[in-house]
Amino acid sequence: MRGKHRVIVQNNRLHYEFEIKRNITIIRGDSATGKTTLINMLRQAENLGNSSGIEVSCDVPCRILEGSNWKLILEHTENSIFFIDEENVFVHTVEFASCVKDSGNYFVLITRENLYGLPYSVEEIYGIHPAGKYQNTRKIYQQMYQIFSKFQNLVTMT
């Protein structure tokens, strides 16, 4: 799978919209910024379909990768975007890194820790911050922001 993929995940209260550009994207952030909420919304949409009240818009399938069958799921899935929460211990294994490297899928990893076994770009590390105010009748728009910009990557040699 190649190219950019726009992902929109929304219900009547929350709206996430972002673009996946590479095979590995990292989402980081402090507690209560909406990382796990994004995963939960995707899980509900995957498990309950339209009855979940959650709309997922993307040109490729967006799925959750978790549990003990993760390797079996990866072996039988192509051209999808997998979202993985930090609670999954397999993310830190050499076996997972090897599967990601050989996969035709994209991966969005939600974690606060460094993943030394995975070759991801510093330009594909994002955070989430709310762009709207929380009110009972108002939708909250979650925005992604790039943690490291191209200008921060410049190193001066003396």
Where are these regions (language model features)?
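Post-Walker A alpha-helix
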Residues: 38-42
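Sensor-1/coupling segment of RecA-like P-loop NTPase cores
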Residues: 100-129
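Conserved glycine(s) of the Walker
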Residues: 33-35
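Conserved P-loop NTPase "ATPase switch" module shared by AAA+ and STAND
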Residues: 70-94
